[in-house]
Swiss-Prot record:
Annotated membrane topology: Multi-pass membrane protein
PANTHER family hit by this protein: NADH DEHYDROGENASE
One Pfam family hit: Proton_antipo_M
The EC number(s) this enzyme carries: 7.1.1.-
Entry's localization field: Cell membrane
Keyword tRNA-binding set for record: no
Catalysed reactions, semicolon-separated: a quinone + NADH + 5 H(+)(in) = a quinol + NAD(+) + 4 H(+)(out)
Originating organism: Salinispora arenicola (strain CNS-205)
Protein family according to the UniProt entry: Belongs to the complex I subunit 2 family.
GO molecular function: NADH dehydrogenase (ubiquinone) activity; NADH:ubiquinone reductase (non-electrogenic) activity; quinone binding
Keyword flag Transcription: no
Protein name, UniProt field: NADH-quinone oxidoreductase subunit N
Enzyme's top EC category: translocase
Listed GO CC annotations: plasma membrane
Length: 517
């Protein structure tokens, strides 16, 4: 009887993910056994300590370059860099999620099943403590993201996709204000996400069939097997290109790229604003981390086949995001279309055929994550008696009512527009220069032109805040608690520093741009 051979597992390399998933389980136990009055502080402490501990382990593993768990997980430069980015941005998002002083009772419904005006709902409105399931759900989502960017086979990537997606569907439905809008957004996200996951899984099946057609090789969906099958090019190209297309649909949905972006405006508008910021920053890092690994490792041999098609998707994404952002009258929907346009710019970096494209994309993800979290931090502060005032007409004259926070938001919008000495300029320059050097000049031209269009809605908000007279409906900016103040400070400072002194992070990204194979 042959001895069972188990795959080798490097638990130190997997420590960041294990810490986050373990913290999520601890959070479930806290919800069950810790007294209600203590839960919020305990949950926030557990989640934040887990994120910081996982980040410490990423730093400890910085020099590791290995594949573990039988080829399922790759620990390499891009995986570690993106895991670190996700954890830093998740810590910043937790500061927004944990804020309770901006709105009495917090931004989240006490329990997902609580109906409006019920006894539990009134209890929360009085400032009494409620349930805190938002923290373990966030930890589960972050844990899934850490696996997603390090997955070395398509089935592991699919499992990670579900682990990160399912908590997000629930988190989107937990808004305390505009509850029906929040639940509608979550339902749309869930249904469309289920379709996208089905496309991804069907694509995995087609790619497996493609690898099975290679003579003298075992079939599989790990990236090394796929790369070898693509290099030999003896199987049916219909299976390969069909599988690539379906897998790309699943990943582009998470990245909010056109034409798979339709969920983004509704979900960004309906979800609790801290969760919107979390998704805009961390989910985008995870999605593009997976895109980089799939197209630079598994399907690298088919680069010249998929580049024109994904290039068209990138241009369409930039156009849709920039043009439709001009028509928006809600600040969260405007930021949603801005996120879509930025997904197009990131695709330009993904398609650059060099390590500079990988490093530029990773730098862009970090820079954009800090800026967009800072933007949503400001959005949480502009409010009236009914909650956040997100309609643009309500922002008229905000610069006269609250010049400090209007000034911070103006700076962030200028960074989104790509003004020099901001992270928006350096990040766009990084991906555009890599694409231009790789012969993708047409994508650079499209990126520059759409950036000019996208600057208009940003400047319109700036003009509205500073050059319009405040009306009776102009809301006040509430004083933030220390958690929101910390998140806003980190985001604004990072946006400035990465615009003025970007080289250290660019060098770090360049040194982490090589995949293990």
């Amino acid at each position: 009887m042959s001895e069972l051979k188990l795959p080798s597992i490097d638990y130190v390399a997997l420590a960041p993910t294990l810490i986050l998933l373990g913290a999520a389980l601890v959070g479930v136990l806290v919800e069950a056994f810790v007294p209600r009055r203590l839960r919020h502080m305990v949950q926030l402490t557990v989640a934040m300590l887990a994120v910081l501990s996982a980040l410490t382990m990423v730093v400890v593993n910085a020099n590791d370059r290995l594949i573990t768990i039988g080829g399922a997980i790759a620990v390499d430069g891009p995986a570690l860099f993106l895991q670190g980015a996700i954890l830093v941005l998740a810590a910043m998002a937790l500061l927004l999620i944990g804020e309770r002083s901006v709105e009495r009772g917090g931004a989240f419904v006490a329990q997902a099943a609580v109906t409006a005006e019920s006894a539990d709902d009134r209890r929360q409105a009085e400032g009494r403590p409620g349930a805190t399931e938002v923290y373990p759900l966030t930890s589960f989502a972050v844990g899934g993201m850490l696996i997603f960017v390090a997955a070395n086979d398509l089935l592991t990537m699919f499992i990670a996709l579900e682990v990160l997606s399912l908590p997000l569907y629930l988190l989107c439905a937990l808004a305390r204000r505009r509850r029906l809008l929040s639940q509608e957004a979550a339902m749309k996200y869930f249904l469309l996400g289920a379709y996208a996951s089905a496309f991804f899984l069907f694509g995995v099946a087609l790619v497996y069939g493609y690898t099975a057609g290679v003579p003298d090789r075992a079939a599989g969906v790990d990236f090394a097997t796929i790369d070898a099958a693509v290099s030999e090019s003896q199987s049916s190209s219909v299976l390969l290109f069909g599988g690539m297309a379906l897998i790309a649909i699943g990943l582009l949905f998470k990245a909010a790229a056109a034409p798979f972006h339709v969920w983004t405006p509704d979900v960004y508008q309906g979800a609790p604003t801290p969760i919107t910021g979390f998704m805009a920053a961390c989910t985008k890092v995870a999605a593009f981390g997976a895109l980089l690994r799939v197209f630079h490792v598994a399907f690298e041999g088919a680069r010249w086949d998929f580049t024109p098609i994904l290039g068209v998707v990138a241009v369409l994404t930039m156009l849709v995001g920039a043009v439709l952002a001009v028509t928006q009258t809600d600040i969260k929907r405007l930021l949603a279309y801005s996120s879509i346009a930025n997904a197009g710019y990131l695709l330009v970096g993904v398609l650059a055929p060099s390590s500079e494209g990988v490093s530029g994309t990773m730098f862009y993800l970090v820079a954009y994550g800090f800026s967009v979290l800072a933007a949503f931090a400001v959005v949480t502060l502009v409010r009236d008696g009914d909650g956040e005032a997100t309609h643009l007409s309500r922002w008229a004259g905000l610069g006269q009512r609250s010049p400090f926070y209007a000034g911070l938001f103006t700076f962030i919008l200028l960074a989104f527009a790509g003004i020099p000495l901001t992270s928006g300029f350096t990040s766009k320059f990084a991906v555009f220069s890599a694409a231009f050097d790789g012969g993708q000049g047409w994508l650079v031209v499209a990126g520059v032109l759409t950036s000019m269009v996208l600057a208009f809605p940003y400047l319109r908000v700036v003009v509205l805040m500073w050059l319009s007279e405040p009306g009776e409906s102009t809301p006040a900016v509430v004083m933030p608690g220390w958690l929101t103040s910390a998140a806003l400070t980190i985001g604004v400072v990072a946006t400035l520093v990465l615009g003025v002194v970007p080289q250290p992070l660019l060098d770090l990204a360049a040194g982490a741009a090589e995949f293990v194979r």
